[in-house]
Amino acid sequence: MTGKKRSASSSRWLQEHFSDKYVQQAQKKGLRSRAWFKLDEIQQSDKLFKPGMTVVDLGAAPGGWSQYVVTQIGGKGRIIACDLLPMDPIVGVDFLQGDFRDELVMKALLERVGDSKVQVVMSDMAPNMSGTPAVDIPRAMYLVELALEMCRDVLAPGGSFVVKVFQGEGFDEYLREIRSLFTKVKVRKPDSSRARSREVYIVATGRKP
């Protein structure tokens, strides 16, 4: 019985996924994921990326955000990306495969950043979802806290942070924490984000010294 329900649910998800206009556009444009459009919307409203910037991309695979940012920062820019999953190479992207929660992976990532002045940290990280908010939300909040810790370590004064967050327990406290570190903070729900999803994007600019 459970198997049948799961099968029906999977079928509905696949039908929704492939009929999604952003999925279709991504396929036509040869993009790695529909996430490309989310970041494009954020860039149109918040102008985060400029030529020559150094950007850290957390939760990068399959590469939609890195693929987008390469077009914005140009050949003199640099992207340092990390994900637990493998990612096909992108010119201009230094990719590290590993679990961001692992201290050794974090250390390796910081070594790759080195003395670079990072202007943007972006995180599209999400845990494997169980479908139970009481389990999923704390897991997701742990990841976004780690992303904010990365900001504290590498983000230059005046820099920006964009992070996917799932609304639920801990969201308001996290938002307050970000407001204490940045001069301007917005919560965005891009049109390309599925309406039924709890996800929103916090866009924080002007990191305080």
UniProtKB/Swiss-Prot annotation:
Mutation effect (residue 34 to A): 4-fold decrease in activity and increase in Km for 50S subunit
Entry cofactors: Mg(2+)
Loss of function: phenotype: Cells lacking this gene show a dramatically altered ribosome profile, a severe growth disadvantage, and a temperature-sensitive phenotype. These effects are overcome by overexpressing either of 2 small GTPases, ObgE/CgtA or EngA.
Outcome after substituting residue 189 to A: 9-fold decrease in activity
Gene Ontology annotations for the cellular component aspect, listed alphabetically: cytosol
Entries under Pfam families matching the protein: FtsJ
UniProt keyword terms in alphabetical order: Cytoplasm, Methyltransferase, rRNA processing, S-adenosyl-L-methionine, Stress response, Transferase
Thermal activity characteristics from the UniProt entry: Optimum temperature is 55 degrees Celsius.
Cell location: Cytoplasm
Binding site for S-adenosyl-L-methionine: 63, 65, 83, 99, 124
List of catalytic residues: 164
EC number(s) stated in the UniProt entry for this protein: 2.1.1.166
The protein's enzyme class: transferase
A Gene Ontology biological process term: ribosomal large subunit assembly
Induction: By heat shock.
Molecular function via GO: rRNA (uridine-2'-O-)-methyltransferase activity
Reactions listed under catalytic activity: uridine(2552) in 23S rRNA + S-adenosyl-L-methionine = 2'-O-methyluridine(2552) in 23S rRNA + S-adenosyl-L-homocysteine + H(+)
Effect upon mutating residue 197 to A: No change in activity. Increase in Km for 50S subunit
UniProt cross-references to CDD domains, sorted A to Z: AdoMet_MTases (cd02440)
SUPFAM superfamilies attached to this UniProt entry: S-adenosyl-L-methionine-dependent methyltransferases
Function: Specifically methylates the uridine in position 2552 of 23S rRNA at the 2'-O position of the ribose in the fully assembled 50S ribosomal subunit.
Protein family (similarity comment): Belongs to the methyltransferase superfamily. RlmE family.
UniProt protein name: Ribosomal RNA large subunit methyltransferase E
Species in which this protein is naturally found: Escherichia coli (strain K12)
Source taxonomy: Bacteria, Pseudomonadati, Pseudomonadota, Gammaproteobacteria, Enterobacterales
